[in-house]
């Protein structure tokens, strides 16, 4: 069975296993390797010297730059060749020398990356990470195993995120930071150790948050970080804000639910 679409363009120096599934108008550039269990969606481009292996699915319209290693075995000494996967969505830009690993059986066996993300050069997404949509990982960012990066989060260059940590939606982590606890949604933080520095106001405005949502989130942030309340007391106050700011109920719910679900604790 031939799984390579006739419109796909494969450079003569590339090595593509005949069992791989290659979609319409895919470009596989010079010296790339595509393994037997790989599925590549329509119009995805592998520039050159790209490795895609393991049980990996790349969606449509992705662009992968030289030196990237996609779907390689996890950097986990417990890994023993189990059948685990990497699933990547659509329209991602994966720059030079990025590494995205398959999952492990110690978690759900899947590393999942959404769509419309930008992975700058040398970024690392370890096993069992969950990366949402519209995120940015700047140069040399390293996500350890089991990290969750929610939609539209931004992580600055040279930053490391400890295993099992979560970075919330629309949060921004400054460069050269060390994230060892959860970063709540909508927050800006920096440092080693990473500490909060208020809301990501510029990012929220750019994302179209309205005035009521911004005011409500300021109050929620204050309850969590500035009023010397326990987490339980802060969550009660955040819940009460939904009555005062009904248009902000959704973002307040997400903020509160994220805080309540934290097992590693929050940055402080």
Give the predicted meaning of each segment.
Residues 1-13, 18-19, 25, 61, ...:
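Terminal amphipathic alpha-helical/low-complexity segments used for targeting or macromolecular assembly
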Residues 3-190, 194-195:
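Structural signal for interior beta-strand "rungs" in well-ordered beta-sheet cores
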């Amino acid at each position: 069975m031939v799984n390579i679409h006739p419109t796909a363009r494969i450079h003569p120096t590339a090595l593509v296993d005949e069992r791989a599934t290659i979609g319409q108008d895919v470009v596989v550039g010079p010296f790339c390797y595509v393994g037997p269990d790989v599925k590549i969606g329509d119009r995805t481009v592998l520039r050159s010297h790209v490795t895609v292996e393991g049980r990996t699915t790349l969606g449509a319209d992705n662009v992968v730059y030289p030196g990237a290693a996609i779907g390689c075995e996890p950097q986990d000494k417990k890994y023993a060749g189990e059948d685990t996967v990497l699933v990547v969505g659509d329209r991602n830009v994966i720059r030079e020398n990025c590494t995205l690993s398959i999952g492990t059986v110690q978690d759900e066996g899947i590393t999942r990356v959404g769509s419309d993300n930008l992975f700058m050069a040398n970024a690392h997404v370890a096993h069992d990470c969950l990366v949402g949509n519209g995120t940015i990982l700047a140069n040399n960012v390293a996500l350890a195993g089991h990290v969750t990066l929610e939609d539209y989060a931004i992580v600055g260059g040279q930053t490391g995120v400890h295993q099992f940590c979560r970075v919330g939606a629309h949060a921004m982590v400054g460069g050269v930071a060390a994230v060892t606890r959860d970063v709540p949604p909508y927050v800006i933080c920096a440092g080693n150790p990473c500490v909060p520095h208020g809301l990501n106001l510029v990012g929220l405005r750019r994302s179209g948050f309205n005035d009521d949502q911004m005011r409500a989130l300021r109050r929620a942030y204050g309850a969590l970080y500035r009023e010397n309340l326990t987490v339980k007391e802060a969550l009660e106050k955040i819940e009460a804000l939904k009555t005062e700011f009904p248009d902000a109920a959704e973002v307040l719910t997400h903020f509160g639910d994220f805080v309540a679900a934290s097992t590693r604790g929050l940055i402080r």
